[in-house]
């Protein structure tokens, strides 16, 4: 359901998103309040993002208003997982680390190497990135990698250690805020 709703969100104007969600969830949240909160959480980035990403992040901020005792609140964080993926791909393309959008579809994120618990950009793949940008890109991919798979894919439920993660509302809200902050950091 959340995936379908997030795709619908990408297709409509930002101004219509709150009404769609208000009708879906039978609540009343003002669109101006959501836009103000996007600016609050992303003061450096809110006016620099592509339209599709902005819509997805508006949806994520809207999801911060959804509260309650849910069985699984993971779906609330789904928009920011998609947004951080798109954000990372845009940076890699803009800094000429990848030649085009198709590269990651064919090769995945092969420009990273794991060092301990973190990932870093392989030195031969820096493109036009500065030292500071290389560090940011490594942190961004580490964050993306450590959150996406355990939230978006089901692990082996028969294994002794199932790493599939389900978020309660509080943890989903925390992940949303941390992701917004990480994206905003790039534009500081």
Per-range role (PLM):
Residues 1-35, 162-187:
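Ampiphathic alpha-helical segments that act as solvent-exposed interaction surfaces
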Residues 93-138:
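Flexible secondary-structure boundary motifs
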Residues 130-188:
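Charge-enriched, short contiguous segments at helix-coil
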Residues 59-68, 124, 128-129, 153:
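Short, charged/polar, low-complexity loop and linker segments
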Residues 12-75:
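Charged alpha-helical initiation segments
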Residues 76-97:
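Hydrophobic alpha-helical packing segments in soluble, helical-rich domains
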Residues 65-69, 92, 96, 156, ...:
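Short, flexible helix-adjacent loops and helix caps
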Residues 72-79, 140, 147:
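Residue-level detector of well-ordered alpha-helical segments, enriched
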């Amino acid at each position: 359901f959340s995936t379908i709703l997030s795709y619908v969100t990408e297709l409509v104007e930002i101004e219509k998103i709150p009404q769609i969600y208000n009708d879906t969830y039978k609540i009343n949240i003002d669109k101006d309040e959501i836009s103000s909160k996007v600016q609050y959480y992303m003061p450096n980035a809110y006016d620099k993002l592509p339209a599709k990403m902005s819509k997805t992040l508006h949806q994520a901020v809207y999801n911060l208003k959804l509260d309650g005792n849910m069985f699984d609140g993971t779906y609330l964080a789904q928009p920011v997982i998609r947004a951080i993926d798109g954000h990372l791909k845009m940076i890699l393309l803009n800094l000429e680390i990848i030649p085009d959008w198709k590269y990651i579809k064919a090769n995945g994120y092969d420009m990273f190497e794991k060092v301990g618990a973190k990932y870093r950009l392989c030195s031969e793949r820096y493109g036009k990135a500065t030292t500071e940008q290389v560090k940011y890109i490594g942190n961004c991919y580490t964050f993306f990698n450590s959150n996406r798979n355990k939230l978006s894919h089901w692990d082996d439920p028969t294994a002794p250690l199932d790493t599939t993660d389900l978020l309660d509302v509080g943890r989903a809200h925390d992940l949303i805020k941390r992701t917004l902050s990480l994206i905003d950091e790039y534009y500081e």
